[in-house]
Amino acid sequence: MNYRMQIQYDGARYRGWQRQAATGDTIQGKLEAILTRRFGRNIEIDGASRTDAGVHALAQIANFHVADDEAVEPEELQKYINQYLPEDIAVTGVVAAGERFHSRLNATGKTYEYHLIPYGTYDVFVRKYAWQMTEPLDIEAMREAAGHVLGS
């Protein structure tokens, strides 16, 4: 059985998505530990994308396999995982996927958003999720730079 999960997380406290030998403070590491406990054996998750330390995700897609005789209802699995996750990580959906589905290899697109607080303005409610500009943007320089990567 292959499960597809949709996950959202506030990455501020984590060292990124990818499991690291030296720390359990990764999103993948947290999820794999819960699934390993649930199934009583090592479960490895494949994510659609790796995020860096401090980066958040609204709809990260991941998948993992279990033997058919270990399969449980997706809704039951989602509830189980969320019960053990910290409050800054949530599995927002679990479905049974085709055996050949792979979250990274079958991804058809990714969207990255960068939030900026303009120079001279302040917003205490988004400060954790946006970069405070320390000087005005040079729009003309940005247009010129974008011309070098357009279409690549």
Walk through the language-model features, giving the residues of each:
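Structured-RNA-binding interfaces characteristic of tRNA pseudouridine synthases
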Residues: M1-S152
